[in-house]
């Protein structure tokens, strides 16, 4: 909640995109009410599969079940870090604020998104340069 509040304070007019990975099924179940309120104010939420640690899905709430109970308009479930990276790269628009939070390998998502966006920017510049100088 504090991270989202800080991002909204710092970037009040920007779209806020969050990728979240719950930590354990039992914790997702136990903290459901807090999860519902902590994501208020975001524009897009992606939820990765729960980082299970020592648990099985029978121990509580899965990421898909958590997603179904959240009252956020624009949400998506992704099965893997690579799927999350692809989804975020296709979703982000100039000026968006993107944050990955949670347990497990969700921290790999921003690090995977950054080079992909950099490559897209370089490709765009190359196309623009070619359009400006078609004889080179």
Question: Where in this protein do the model-derived segments appear?
Answer:
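ATP-dependent carboxylate-amine ligase
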Residues: 1-136
């Amino acid at each position: 909640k504090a991270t989202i509040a800080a991002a909204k304070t710092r970037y009040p007019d920007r779209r806020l995109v969050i990728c979240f990975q719950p930590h354990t099924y039992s914790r997702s179940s136990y903290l459901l009410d807090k999860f519902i309120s902590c994501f208020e104010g975001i524009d897009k939420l992606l939820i990765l599969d729960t980082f299970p640690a020592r648990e099985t899905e029978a121990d509580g709430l899965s990421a898909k079940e958590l997603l179904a109970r959240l009252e956020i308009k624009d949400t998506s479930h992704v099965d893997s870090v690579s799927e999350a990276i692809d989804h975020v790269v296709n979703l982000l628009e100039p000026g968006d604020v993107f944050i990955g939070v949670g347990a497990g390998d969700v921290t790999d998502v921003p690090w995977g998104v950054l080079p992909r966006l950099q490559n897209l920017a370089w490709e765009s510049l190359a196309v623009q340069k070619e359009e400006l100088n078609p004889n080179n």
